Amino acid sequence: MRKILIVIDMQKDFVSGILGNAETKAIVPKVCEKIRNWDEDCILYTLDAHEEPFYSTTEEGKRVPLHCVYCEDGYYLEDDIQAALMDYEDARDDQEKAGRFDSVVKETFGAVDELPYMIEKCMPEHPFQIHMVGVCTDICVISNALVLRSAFPKVEIYVDASCCAGTTPENHKAALAVMKANCINIINEE
């Protein structure tokens, strides 16, 4: 069965910047390893993107500091993640296998239209599995997992808990429990 890997918001502001924490930094090597070892045809990664003055008028903007400002440093992928994606592409080229990665830019927690569309582009034939990693477990990972659960009711979805981090360890665990309750498979949970 074919599989697609979705890497959620592994951007500088979420990992080592304004919204980062010890847990988000700690998962970077695991996420890089997962990307480099991905032996399937497609990886998608989301990019949270905000701009003023619009952001400050949103509910998120009223509660969360401005982050991932489009085309500023914090918007871009963490350097190690970007390098892992390039290694994935190079390895696929060396093996003469198809392999690609692409971005999905989103302005809110869940990429409601964009992510299902891009998955269908990458995986036009069913059945397939969706595998997810990234940050923040309790915000964008869960939001996108639930979007995909609704968009693809017959597809198995897996979230690798060891490659996710939340705003707090408690929120991470709570989000995993909610995803389990919504028929999302949680793997590598400690």
Task: Describe the predicted segments one by one.
Residues M1-R100, P124-F128, K154-Y158, T167, ...:
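Active-site acidic carboxylates
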Residues R149:
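Gly/Ala-rich phosphate-binding loop of Rossmann-like dinucleotide-binding domains
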Residues S103-S143, A165-E190:
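Conserved N-terminal glycine/acidic-rich loop preference
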